[in-house]
């Protein structure tokens, strides 16, 4: 009987244990990673084995004792299985909240300045609730705070770190109030933390902003919203660039069409030329007195292609042009005095076959104008014309540019020594260097021309381009050969593009056979003066180098005073070096600013000696010697302003 009663009691206890009455939640000790992964967790259910054990025991009991109480005992299964029902596992519940509502991974949006990151050697995927509780208590003890004030915000598996924050003592549940990380770390007992939590292997405790800020910012950038923002920004940028390119292309097409229209409408009108009647028409057989015949007038119209079309009109219907040479305002290269293409074919430069340049009618007319044009201005007239800029512009447009046809220079490969392929030296006034050998004609070439001065003085100036890397030796050879006392440089080394190379040394340099020494440097307001000594063998020459740097890019100076002062200083040095060679003047191409300086210098001498000035004749004379001198109408006006400023300084006694 005792055996019959004891066995069911034992089965009852086993079923109670299987129902969870004595064991609390055994799955609390599962790893955090198992809960976090949201995968189904299979928990071993003790009740299944216990059920099997009970069934076996009952079968044995029935077999041995055959007691009528067997039916009553077998009914205990339903009572045992229904007592203390186990709730189904819900993965949405936080593992840390199941046993301790105060200990949970909160995942709150805490500012980076309030977050502390603790780096562990221990794998954080193995942390369960017990270990996290120990960790929180250890951190709280090291800070001297309550464990409830230490909050584990999240676990960072990639870097094996625990992110936590500390709340004030009066924090209410659900609030995100937290203390500053820097303030918390100042009160942290690091040694105590390592001693109290040795099993975690704490390697570093730092604010979140120094450890994870870059990662968070990168996560924000490559988030869905960040990706859309980048795509939108790139799309807007591409649209803007495309619109700018379209506008630029439309502007280029408009300028091209306007330029083509100007070329089509370009005409040169010559003054009427009386045509003599044929002798057979002028005489009558039976009369000694011949009536005067109204002379017919031949008008010659030269189209842009250089073809002459004669047109005969009666003199009574012919209107005389107020100017002997009138030209509509056109571009710089169209006014070059030649219809030959400006493109220089480098492959044809090596040809040694001699050729003869034939002047076209237009070139002959242009040269006649350059040699005869004149407009003498008194001092009062000079002041008046300076106030009328439109008159100066119209006058400038009538002056032929007189650029040189490349075929006129019979030197193979001379294009390698030209800075600009359309700016070439006039052959009649070209500076020829002494050849290194008889067969090397290229060694005699330099892009420079002798320029006549006041009263037609020969070789008063040399106008040349800014030296290039391969022409620096040629430049110094020319200065030595011509015994030039002064060099005037009116350009910077670079203005958007390279304008001139640095062709002088800092102290001493050797260029070919010429040694150059810098003996002194003087800084003035608008230019720098260098005293140079040139040596070749036992001979020496003293040269002054003026570097004018105040000329602005792509326009004329606002005031002519600095250039006028430079001109006066150069003129003083030239007079002190009487008997020596020409003054060398260069800018970049050797025609624009160079022409302004030389024209101003000649005009000032004329005003000083005669009391009048003929700027038109001066510029025409310069273009005969070197094509394109005084390159733009703005520079032509600037020359008149400089002459007017010089005139205002002359004494009233100067004869007009």
UniProtKB/Swiss-Prot annotation:
It catalyses: O-phospho-L-tyrosyl-[protein] + H2O = L-tyrosyl-[protein] + phosphate. This is Receptor-type tyrosine-protein phosphatase R. Sequesters mitogen-activated protein kinases (MAPKs) such as MAPK1, MAPK3 and MAPK14 in the cytoplasm in an inactive form. The MAPKs bind to a dephosphorylated kinase interacting motif, phosphorylation of which by the protein kinase A complex releases the MAPKs for activation and translocation into the nucleus. Isoform gamma may have a role in patterning and cellular proliferation of skeletal elements in the precartilaginous/cartilaginous skeleton. Residues 274-289 have a biased composition (Polar residues). Expressed in the heart, brain, spleen, lung, liver, skeletal muscle, kidney and testis. Isoform alpha is expressed throughout the granular layer of the cerebellar but not within the Purkinje cells, also in the villi of the ileum and jejunum and both the villi and crypts of the duodenum. Isoform beta is expressed only in the Purkinje cells. Isoform gamma is expressed throughout the brain, the villi and crypts of the duodenum, jejunum and ileum and expressed at low levels in the proximal colon. It comes from Mus musculus (Mouse). Changing residue 338 to E: Mimics phosphorylation by PKA, prevents MAPK binding. Glycans are attached at residues 23, 128. It comes from the Eukaryota. Residues 392-646 form the Tyrosine-protein phosphatase domain. GO terms for cellular component: cell junction; cytosol; plasma membrane. Substrate binds at residues 553, 587-593, 631. Changing residue 338 to A: Loss of phosphorylation by PKA, constitutive MAPK binding. GO terms for molecular function: protein kinase binding; protein tyrosine phosphatase activity.
